[in-house]
Amino acid sequence: MQRAGAGARRASDCGPAPYRPRCIAKLAQYVGSFPVDDLDTQESVGLVQQQLWALQDCSRRRAVILKFSLQGLKIYSGEGEVLLMAHALKRILYATWYPAACQFAFIARNPRSPSSKLFCHLFVGSQPGEVHILYLLLCRSFQLAYLLQHPEERAQSEPCLAPVGDLSLKPLCSPGVPPALVREPFSRDQLSQNVHALVSFRRLPAEGLLGSNGKELPESEGRGGTRHIRLGNPYCSPTLVRKKAIRSKVIRSGAYRGCTYETQLQLSAREAFPAAWEAWPRGPGGPSCLVENEGSLTENIWAFAGLSRSCALSLLRRDVHGAFLLWPEPGTSDQWSLSVRTQCGVVPHQVFRNHLGRFCLEHLPAEFPSLEALVESHAGVERSLFCPLSMGRLNPTYEEQDCGTEGRFPRTLRPLSHAKSEAELQGLG
């Protein structure tokens, strides 16, 4: 077991960075890191699961801050001053979580190190929800990064497993004009009671295509005159927004919550892949359809929202055993298709909602109040499905090696083989 220690660097010692991608910061407890054995992919994942189970009662913990973006994941000390780890997204292989032990873990390799030197980094939280959001953010980052790298594989229409609730974002489309996204009015439960929770309104989706009276602007104005709004209007700073809200007696202290996690990842994607972002056609399947609220993160990960079904199934065939995709059947609101990666390939199952509004798997008597409960029940239960559902996901954008002098090495999804190393993590001491 290795822990962050004296080898860590202060964030201020890294020098000024010309580009700072938007990120999402979350708190957690860092337990430690351990090397991954040199075994077959599935066997290595199984041994990692056993090791995580053995470490569930480990008392060696350290408060840290995890910062997610489409460029990667950074781990800072609890005060946010010391950078303990930095992993580019392309070097993170696998992510998983265990609700019973409140554990979140991911497998990654170090920069410029071979694919044989992989390490698993373990974090815990005080309750399952805390580690679940860490897992969701990392897995959705995997998917969004893949979508930006492969825009030709996008879906023509986005699947939706369930209503997203009160935080809907409505596209406004007109011929020749990119769709704008308008947020619904804020409700009481969307007002933060914490002044530190304020996030700038400039992180909201582009509102530049709408005038002050709510009408659409001409195409020339929408594309040119409002560009500065999309890129961040200085007059929409957090301080000014908060002061204006207090003066108008909308709130006493505090401010509006920021956009959703997915919205911030979307903006990060625009910055990380500007060429792909601009080349992506506006409309169904485009970047605007990737905007979603926190409550829909789980469903969009299950369905690999934004990717065509054939491409999603192709990626599923190369994932770990138990990985699955869950999407609604076209033309119906009461049936879903559950595809599970097994030892024999991808096995389809049918999920339906009965007359009582409860969810069931075809040919199985058990009923569940929600899709989440159904998935949780069939995770780790050998007798219910041919292969139990897995909480782990492989990163489809993982690269076994870094860029060389002659260009980028080909990507692959069999990175857990050839992993045998007792070397210490760089910068972890």
Swiss-Prot record:
Where is the protein situated, by its record's location annotation? Postsynaptic density
List the GO cellular component terms. postsynaptic density
Expression by tissue, per the entry, reads:
Highly expressed in brain, particularly in Purkinjie cells in the cerebellum and the cornu ammonis of the hippocampus.
Q: Which InterPro entries match?
A: PH-like_dom_sf, PTB/PI_dom, SH2, SH2_dom_sf
Annotated signal sequence is none
Q: How does it assemble?
A: Interacts with BCR.
Can you name this protein? Answer: SH2 domain-containing protein 5
- Taxonomic source organism: Mus musculus (Mouse)
Name of the coding gene: Sh2d5
